[in-house]
């Protein structure tokens, strides 16, 4: 039976028999992610992985994964206040849609 991966896993460790961890990114310490995840192929050929954050203060992050073994954080945005979270997101072409959830009605 396979054990749950250790958060400090190294790229050279085998976590599964049919998959290999290529890299890990700490997202500047804001790794609490929601369901929102989308891959974008840019006009210049880069692959950007967009990630929604589960809780404030971060809204979403963009990670350049063109070289999957060397991911680069290229943008990380802030929510307008602590009572929101970015539940999910999607990207089509150059347009991103983010769904927010509020902890208080009417914000």
Model regions and ranges:
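Feature marking well-ordered beta-strand scaffolds used for ligand recognition
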Residues: 1-107
């Amino acid at each position: 039976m396979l054990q749950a991966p250790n958060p400090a896993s190294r790229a050279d460790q085998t976590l599964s028999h049919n998959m290999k961890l290529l890299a890990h990114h700490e997202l500047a310490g804001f790794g609490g992610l929601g369901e929102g995840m989308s891959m974008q192929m840019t006009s210049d050929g880069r692959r950007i992985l967009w990630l929604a954050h589960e809780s404030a203060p971060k809204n979403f992050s963009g990670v350049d994964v063109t070289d999957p073994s060397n991911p680069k954080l290229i943008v990380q945005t802030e929510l307008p206040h602590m009572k929101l979270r970015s539940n999910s997101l999607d990207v089509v072409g150059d347009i991103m849609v983010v769904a927010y959830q509020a902890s208080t009605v009417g914000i």
